């Protein structure tokens, strides 16, 4: 790859959309699937057959059915090296809210969730809306004691069960209730609906920002607090069975207050079948209470292990969240963690280490935010001052390159190109995976915090404000 920089201002045409509001009825719940999202089987060749017409021979439908493409959140799409990129379409203008969630793909459709509490299925090839389902009225910012999203609707990235053809999303509904919906990916019809606020939680101060994890017939849902840390909130993980059986599973972070699980990658699944989350600061400074920690949970949400830095009390008192980035799962089960302090920690998958028991640690950047991407032993780390490539060995890691002066959104990798949005400039930038040199750049509209692209074979998607952009990879 040469170091050319391609700048494109994407011009969009207005598309008028009509919106319908669905009534809240408990409908038949789809059968449970033992398969985690990400399997290539089960995605239909066409959503709403007869409506879709392909206009580009360069785009092949593919499946990116959960945050960063798989349950370990690697964010890597293997493909031939990228030799060129061009904008395919931008639209549909008229999305009824901002896009914080990562777009997902299945079959010929890309699925977009909005803060207007709607899910859209959009044709991968031409950007036409295949269907739209509105799930209710979002919660206005004026109804919340603090926060920076207005209105608040669907914030966490949904998950698709390809075996049942169902997309699951948590909608925050006015006047203040979190509801897990299951929708048919074929036509957007509502298949299931369940309230997923944990017993004793106050929905008005619990934010569902982290990505959903679907595994073995359970949707795992992380919660943190609102921007401003107002109210008596705790971090939670709630589990809802897709077949509707039993009561909700739940794990409350045992803090006096705070300790939110708010990293956008949400819950990660390890090769051992256990779940990994990272928490933000709590108010504790004398007795450890699982604030600023990495926690390993069983599928039934029992605590199995944990790690916290030796300076956890200082991190707590300074609002220096370890959980500003979700855990990165290595192929052998080891865990990499970084937070606002910018210090990376390598943890053993067989024993996370308790307080101060890391295998290795080193300062990497000014502060990590969002979700990482991983290609083999290499991790791409989003920081507020740089995008950093870290290479992990058996018991340590080292920095391979650092793209400084880049306010990095959560990266993904397609072939030999690392893609990330510069949050400060609203540019989508492609970096050479080996060297860290910028190769491509595209100007977007305004973007939201922690935004991340998604990919399918030959195509890249990114949400910006209330817009979806598509790029063809050659």
Question: What kind of region is each of these model predictions?
Answer:
Residues 25-474:
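Noncatalytic, solvent-exposed loop/strand surfaces
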